[in-house]
Design a protein with these regions (language model features):
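A structural signal for multi-pass alpha-helical bundles of membrane permease subunits
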Residues: 1-198
Length: 198
């Protein structure tokens, strides 16, 4: 999910930051306005769409949302970072014979690495600890995510074994902590320089 989110958000951000097309400002305004919508408003339309597609009780809803850049915060963050990169880089790449996609891959992606790591880490954190969306889209116990499985251990009708709950909580937090320490250089740089580079 994290990889799909970073790739789709980068492609959409590149389009907004570097190209002029009809309705660009309106589309960007729509993107920004979706940032203001709480998840509770979006959950019912998404649920009906995924129900009609027949992908409920699976992990496909999470993949589909990330493939189609349904997380506007990351797109906005990457747009701001890309706007801070000099356009002369694109022009010099064009003079050297690079096409649009090659310019993105060879020239801009290495410079976008801090912002992409930040977006990836945020997405991993939010997806890994997501309880509400998992509860809505997944029904089978065998497909439960860690957050849903952790909730199962807190059954009020039986005695709660706190040592199991604490052990499972540590397991739930461990991947995020490890990932943060591995990528903290890029994460801090991406947050500090988003929209200021150039």
């Amino acid at each position: 999910v994290t990889l799909f989110t970073v790739v789709s958000s980068t492609l959409v951000a590149y389009g907004f930051a570097r190209f002029e097309f009809r309705g660009k400002k309106i589309f960007f305004l729509i993107l920004l306005s979706t940032l203001m919508l709480p998840n509770a408003i979006l959950i019912i339309p998404r649920y009906t769409i995924f129900r009609d597609l027949g992908v409920l009780d699976s992990y496909y809803p999470f993949y589909l949302m990330s493939v189609f850049a349904c997380y506007p915060f990351f797109t906005y963050m990457l747009v701001q970072f890309t706007r801070g990169l000099p356009r002369e880089l694109d022009e010099s790449a064009c003079m050297d014979g690079c096409g649009t996609f090659r310019t993105l891959i060879s020239i801009l992606l290495p410079l976008l690495k801090p912002a992409m790591f930040s977006a990836g880490l945020f997405q991993f954190l939010w997806t890994d600890n997501d309880y509400f969306n998992s509860l809505i889209y997944i029904n089978s116990v065998k497909k439960f995510t860690i957050s849903l499985a952790l909730r199962l251990t807190l059954d009020s009708e039986t005695v709660i074994t706190w040592k199991n709950v604490m052990a499972m909580s540590c397991l739930a937090v461990l991947p995020v902590v490890i990932l943060f320490f591995l990528c903290q250089k890029y994460f801090v740089e991406g947050i500090a320089t988003t929209g200021l580079k150039g």
